[in-house]
Amino acid sequence: MPAGSNEPDGVLSYQRPDEEAVVDQGGTSTILNIHYEKEELEGHRTLYVGVRMPLGRQSHRHHRTHGQKHRRRGGRGKGASQGEEGLEASAHDTPSQRVQFILGTEEDEEHVPHELFTELDEICMKEGEEAEWKETARWLKFEEDVEDGGERWSKPYVATLSLHSLFELRSCLINGSVLLDMRASSIEEISDLILDQQELLRDLSDSVRVKVREALLKKHHHQNEKKRNNLIPIVRSFAEVGKKQSDPHSMDRDGQTVSPQSAPATNLEVKNGVNCEHSPVDLSKADLHFMKKIPAGAEASNVLVGEVDTLDRPIVAFVRLSPAVLLSGLTEVPIPTRFLFILLGPVGKGQQYHEIGRSMATIMTDEIFHDVAYKAKERDDLLAGIDEFLDQVTVLPPGEWDPSIRIEPPKNVPSQEKRKMPGVPNGNICHVEPEPHGGHSGPELERTGRLFGGLVLDVKRKAPWYWSDYRDALSLQCLASFLFLYCACMSPVITFGGLLGEATEGRISAIESLFGASMTGIAYSLFAGQPLTILGSTGPVLVFEKILFKFCKDYALSYLSLRACIGLWTAFLCIVLVATDASSLVCYITRFTEEAFASLICIIFIYEAIEKLIHLAETYPIHMHSQLDHLSLYYCRCALPENPNNHTLQYWKEHSIPTADVNWANLTVSECQEMHGEFIGSACGHHGPYTPDVLFWSCILFFATFIVSSTLKTFKTSRYFPTRVRSTVSDFAVFLTIFTMVILDFLIGVPSPKLQVPSVFKPTRDDRGWFISPIGPNPWWTVIAAIIPALLCTILIFMDQQITAVIINRKEHKLKKGCGYHLDLLVVAIMLGVCSLMGLPWFVAATVLSITHVNSLKLESECSAPGEQPKFLGIREQRVTGLMIFVLMGCSVFMTAVLKFIPMPVLYGVFLYMGVSSLQGIQFFDRLKLFGMPAKHQPDFIYLRHVPLRKVHLFTLVQLTCLVLLWVIKASPAAIVFPMMVLALVFVRKVMDLCFSKRELSWLDDLMPESKKKKLDDAKKKEEEEEAEKMLDIGGDKFPLESRKLLSSPGKNNSFRCDPSEINISDEMPKTTVWKALSINSGNTKEKSPFN
């Protein structure tokens, strides 16, 4: 078409006959039958493919400045020879190269790709009713069909297409109208422009035009518009509000629109080019539930196919609107339409049109074609996108697969980035460099060489995030985490205090443990570098306290004073470690050490939970082999002890109890226990009369807590109830379980053992206060001698704290606010010194509680397409949950009336749940299960691809041996050296370099997530296969792109193929019989349909 010709506004001038000349079997039609000379066509091609053209446009018509040479007739000089070379070369451009060239072009505001929602509508005829467009399928990521009954959507599934329908779609784009960047504001205007274009391509009578226009303007019926005879829809449209421009995403979740005054147009709305003027949208018909799944800024792609009785051959049009327009009633959800594909044909081929429509809708959801559709400048670009799609498809044999079977969406969809990346001359594909395997390298662990240099960097790193640590806690998930972990932390703190009270004769007991945990936890949550870590008591600390108390008792030293000296020295040594950046040594702690330590702690939790349940049999024994015939002879009564011990005699003396005058047989159980009486009789146990059913009821509570907690936690992935309900139940899983078990225990009434919380805030012993003198009655030299045990204690604190911190700061947790190893250790050191002066227990990072805390705060994508698995986004990093846990723990003294109803077996069940759940994802246990598994049944673990199985077993055996040694030391009187053994694991790992290669250790001993490493491995393997099959030409020209990658330009020096196995699907497709048949049909008389 001459440059000076006038076109209807919205029809682009790119549809010149020269650009319509698709290299195929001559099936391309022209607009005005204007024939260009071969030289001109060749020159045009040479200019387009040989030079990277900018996307800047003189006008919306998209004319490119070709210069005078483009308009010359005749002249077989230099320009013509270049044109011939370009034409010959362009025929050999692979679709992949062409697509990479298209995607490498500059972007402008009108061609920025958005997320797409695609809808397939078909003309539906009902008896006695007027024909209308009916929604039959939709795509956000996967396909959803309206079931035959028409009452519901199908489950999302992976769309399977026939190759024939894809060929037919390609033929449609070759022979139909392609209107890019049409400017229109209504469906009426779009219909007129399409029909105007059709009249240029073919003879279209007025009657046919009227019928087709009527068909295009018919009402659209969507699946969500069910019968509402009993409902009065509240029709609220943009027109009624004042026809003001408003973004469709300015709706709230109840369907109310935000007024233009309260929601001014944002830069995003202007950038998206949404034109909502004169587009009344009935929000009462919008599917607001489905709207939540559509990302903000998404646009629509409408596919309209159907039969019109007045047509003798199909009308095909592909339209891209610029800007996107909000068309009332066209789409199921009120979002602007960017693309339309229209296929109207003669009656009798409805199923064929349906499959072509499905193919168009499916290909629009393809990540690569989606971008090509946004950036395409002409028909050839769209065809290149389809050819590239065909080049990547996987074919299922017809005799081995039933197409009616719906394929479930995969859990992980492979990345398509590789398809976007250009080839390089040696045949390799440019790819992003993988992240380094394993290790903890990062700025947090770099030695600065300055005094407190690491601490200063930690403070600078965490300070900008401090206030966001409180704002980010405004979530229901944080409330669930706080309630769950409060219950989980209370029991071990009280239990630890009770054990410590027994070991120290009450000098440090439950009330001191509660107070110390609360004070230390609050300070740590407020000022630590990684507030996700939960502080708690550890077994080695208890062993250290027992040994120290025994030493002080043997040498008549004051236990609390000597302990205060040791604590102050330990705090000082930890501060020295902070000053010298000793935390940088954490980089030597690899997965080998982490997993051994974490596995041990998890096993200890599981073991102690079961052990505590079994110990209930001592207090509540089972009366086995009961002789029911002698049941009437059983009795248990209180009596005066025959041989009272000194403690009992002292009690009687202090309370002036006349033992001879007491009627012991008439005392109740509680009165007998209070007066230190003795139970005698065949129905008595060690601690009083037999209490029936307590042990069995405790076992029921224990296992029920574990099973219900595990079930509710996985409820998020179940098929029942809406997403919000499932997420809430999953977040509150443990708290709901504890609450349910408490109610059940209260209703059953069996006297199970309950949580005992101190009810008075004062020291356990009257002979001590809240401040302990470091010297006290001890000799002065004890202050200096205390540095010796303090060295061992420092190693204990450092290893416990930093190994837990390393586990929490793993890369797979995707933490964004950084970590602070030096700052964490400083806060722990200061609070350790404070607790020592106050006579309170020492607290360090608790591994299992910290892992459980992190797991309870996992973030997943909320806006996920139907069928798409939510993506793990990271952890909700904040300080409030830890702060509230320890604040409420300090207030527990005043909540005794409520806490006394919590059965201890329920808390033991929570311990079991935390231990088992924390084991998930530990590679060591996955490798341990391989021992009893035949090779053909072994999972596709990434390390099994690269490391021989015998080496994997050897690595696991070494790790298992170390774990057993740690367990033996932990359970023996030598438990005080446990931190030294954990430190020894680092050296064991170093020795393993002699038995394993670096490559094997990189796969077996690192911190990289499994899914990510497997993705890189699959990409690398596919790259090697492609390298073996394809060899790209070395002489291709290259253009520097914004991404700083090299892109081979289509159309120059690409005609020579070194590898005869390399094919160009665009060249090979016309050679197929199927394509020849389609081409012959499309070239026949106009009376015939091209879809025979």
UniProtKB/Swiss-Prot annotation:
Stated family: Belongs to the anion exchanger (TC 2.A.31) family.
Extracellular compartment segments: 1-478, 529-565, 617-687, 753-778, 846-881, 926-962
Domain of life according to the entry: Eukaryota
The entry's keywords: Anion exchange, Antiport, Cell membrane, Cytoplasmic vesicle, Disulfide bond, Glycoprotein, Ion transport, Membrane, Sodium, Sodium transport, Synapse, Transmembrane, Transmembrane helix, Transport
Residue ranges with Basic and acidic residues bias: 243-255
Disulfide pairings: C636-C684, C638-C672
Glycosylation sites: N646, N666
Name of the protein in its database record: Electroneutral sodium bicarbonate exchanger 1
InterPro entries registered for this protein in UniProt: Band3_cytoplasmic_dom, HCO3_transpt-like_TM_dom, HCO3_transpt_euk, Na/HCO3_transpt, PTrfase/Anion_transptr
Main localization, broad class: membrane
Cytoplasmic side: 500-507, 587-595, 709-731, 800-824, 903-904, 984-1092
Species lineage: Eukaryota, Metazoa, Chordata, Craniata, Vertebrata
Assigned GO CC terms: apical plasma membrane; asymmetric synapse; axon terminus; basolateral plasma membrane; dendrite; glial cell projection; glutamatergic synapse; hippocampal mossy fiber
Outcome of swapping A846C: 40% of wild-type transporter activity. No effect on cell membrane localization
Region (Disordered): 1-26, 55-95, 243-263
